[in-house]
Amino acid sequence: YIDETYLKNVLDAPLIEAAKHNIAVAAIILVEPAAKCIDPDLGILLQHPNYLRGVYTMPNMTNLESVNCYAAAFDFLAKRYCTTNNRYGRIAHWIMHNEVDGSVDWTNMGIKPVTVFADTYIKSMRICYNIVRQYDEHAEVFASLTHSWTQIANVGWWLYTSKEIIDLLNV
């Protein structure tokens, strides 16, 4: 199912080179909407059911099959890139999605109250954390937010402020 040539050339090679030079690598985890996914069935499974538009979708956390698929992807990546021998290189930092306060474009799951959005985001982060830490106790998982702490940066693209999401992450 996985294109080994792609992995070796596009992911492994630069990660191995970074590991040789003791460079810590951060990976941004993004989920393409089904229409852009090379495997439409997989895309439908991972795309949030309320996705409306945007570059990326929030992963689907609404059913067990989708959650298990999402978790399996992390398990595959963590087994490969969180080992002590660095055979394929290493991902030290896992950045969950992109500028999530700009959710309309970067992690679209439709228009939701900030509490519902943050709950889904936290679930996505926890899946990553719980899986990668099984393979690398030093791996770190980060949130991704804009610099727009208390005001919505771009009305129409942003639904929440960074502070609203951070406050809910800290509950």
Describe every region a protein language model picked out:
Residues 1-82, 86, 92-95, 101-113, ...:
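N-terminal substrate-binding region of glycoside hydrolase catalytic domains
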